[in-house]
């Protein structure tokens, strides 16, 4: 049952008016005004509980759909990156390997993609274990470990891509036409639909390398950026 509506005495109104208004000349006007009665009644109700008590437990409150947690754009991008972007880039790296027998970028992309999934598994296990133990989702040491994995993955791929695109001359000769390559389509596709043309494996390699590098950079910034901002601006750390 809801508690009865409290009647506020004149002395209580005078006391509350001092709390609300710091100017003594306006206190009398505020106390005599009937428009402020709902405000006074609400403040008194808050002092001992009731339907408007701000200290109610979460079990007794109703959270609107606007304030409920939901998938963010980063969550959707992370899923698309893990399921689509990285595997497709690795396929293009494999096409370049089949055309030139240069397996450096293909090996690096494959291993770093596996490392990305390994990091995801570690994060899920840490969150599950901490929540089961009634702790915060991620401790400081766990966030540090995940951050090292993210930064290392980005640095290794950027170094490998830089060597393949700018130091190894095969990509340049393939793009300019000085070095011919085989058709990159698999034999199974060629048997069903004979194909004698296709995009250059070097062009696909450049596109895939740029997309994969951007994916790594976005992943690093989205993981490191919020934590650095909270540490610098709020002098604290986040636990997820």
From Swiss-Prot:
<feature type="transmembrane region" description="Helical">
    <location>
        <begin position="104"/>
        <end position="124"/>
    </location>
</feature>
<keyword id="KW-1040">Host Golgi apparatus</keyword>
<keyword id="KW-1048">Host nucleus</keyword>
<dbReference type="GO" id="GO:0044423">
    <property type="term" value="C:virion component"/>
</dbReference>
<feature type="transmembrane region" description="Helical">
    <location>
        <begin position="203"/>
        <end position="225"/>
    </location>
</feature>
<feature type="transmembrane region" description="Helical">
    <location>
        <begin position="76"/>
        <end position="96"/>
    </location>
</feature>
<keyword id="KW-1043">Host membrane</keyword>
<dbReference type="GO" id="GO:0020002">
    <property type="term" value="C:host cell plasma membrane"/>
</dbReference>
<keyword id="KW-0472">Membrane</keyword>
<keyword id="KW-1039">Host endosome</keyword>
<dbReference type="GO" id="GO:0044200">
    <property type="term" value="C:host cell nuclear membrane"/>
</dbReference>
<dbReference type="Pfam" id="PF04544">
    <property type="entry name" value="Herpes_UL20"/>
</dbReference>
<keyword id="KW-0946">Virion</keyword>
<keyword id="KW-0812">Transmembrane</keyword>
<dbReference type="InterPro" id="IPR007629">
    <property type="entry name" value="Herpes_UL20"/>
</dbReference>
<protein>
    <recommendedName>
        <fullName>Protein UL20 homolog</fullName>
    </recommendedName>
</protein>
<dbReference type="GO" id="GO:0019058">
    <property type="term" value="P:viral life cycle"/>
</dbReference>
<keyword id="KW-1133">Transmembrane helix</keyword>
<dbReference type="GO" id="GO:0044178">
    <property type="term" value="C:host cell Golgi membrane"/>
</dbReference>
<feature type="transmembrane region" description="Helical">
    <location>
        <begin position="147"/>
        <end position="167"/>
    </location>
</feature>
<comment type="subunit">
    <text>Interacts with gK (via N-terminus); this interaction plays a role in the coordinate transport of UL20 and gK to the trans-Golgi network (TGN), and is required for their cell surface expression. Interacts with gB. Interacts with host STING1; this interaction inhibits host interferon-beta promoter activation.</text>
</comment>
<comment type="function">
    <text>Plays an essential role in egress of virus particles from the nucleus, cytoplasmic envelopment and virus-induced cell fusion. Forms a functional protein complex with gK and this interaction is absolutely essential for their coordinate intracellular transport, gK glycosylation, expression on host cell surface, and function. Together, they modulate gB-mediated virus-induced cell fusion and virion egress and therefore actively participate in these processes. In addition, plays a role in inhibiting the type I interferon responses by suppressing STING1-mediated activation of the IFN-beta promoter.</text>
</comment>
<comment type="similarity">
    <text>Belongs to the alphaherpesvirinae UL20 family.</text>
</comment>
<dbReference type="GO" id="GO:0016020">
    <property type="term" value="C:membrane"/>
</dbReference>
<dbReference type="GO" id="GO:0044175">
    <property type="term" value="C:host cell endosome membrane"/>
</dbReference>
<keyword id="KW-1032">Host cell membrane</keyword>
């Amino acid at each position: 049952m809801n508690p009865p509506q409290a009647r506020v005495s004149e002395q209580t109104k005078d006391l509350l008016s001092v709390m609300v208004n710091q100017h003594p000349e306006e206190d009398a006007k505020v106390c005599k005004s009937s428009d402020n009665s709902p405000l006074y009644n609400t403040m008194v109700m808050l002092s001992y509980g009731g339907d408007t008590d701000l200290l109610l437990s979460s079990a007794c409150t109703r959270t609107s759909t606007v304030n409920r947690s939901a998938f963010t754009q980063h969550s959707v991008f992370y899923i698309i990156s893990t399921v689509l972007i990285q595997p497709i880039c690795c396929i293009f790296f494999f096409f370049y390997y089949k055309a030139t027998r240069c397996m450096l970028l293909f090996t690096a992309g494959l291993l770093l993609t596996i490392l990305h999934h390994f990091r995801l598994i570690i994060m899920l296990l840490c969150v599950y274990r901490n929540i089961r133990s009634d702790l915060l989702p991620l401790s400081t040491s766990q966030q540090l470990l995940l951050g090292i994995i993210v930064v290392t993955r980005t640095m290794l791929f950027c170094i490998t891509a830089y060597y393949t695109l700018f130091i190894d001359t095969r990509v340049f000769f393939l793009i300019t036409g000085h070095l011919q390559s085989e058709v990159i389509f698999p034999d199974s596709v060629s048997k069903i639909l004979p194909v004698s043309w296709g995009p250059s494996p070097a062009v696909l390699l450049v596109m895939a390398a740029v997309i994969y590098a951007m994916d790594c950079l976005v992943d690093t910034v989205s993981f490191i950026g919020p934590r650095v901002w909270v540490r610098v601006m709020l002098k604290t750390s986040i636990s997820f």
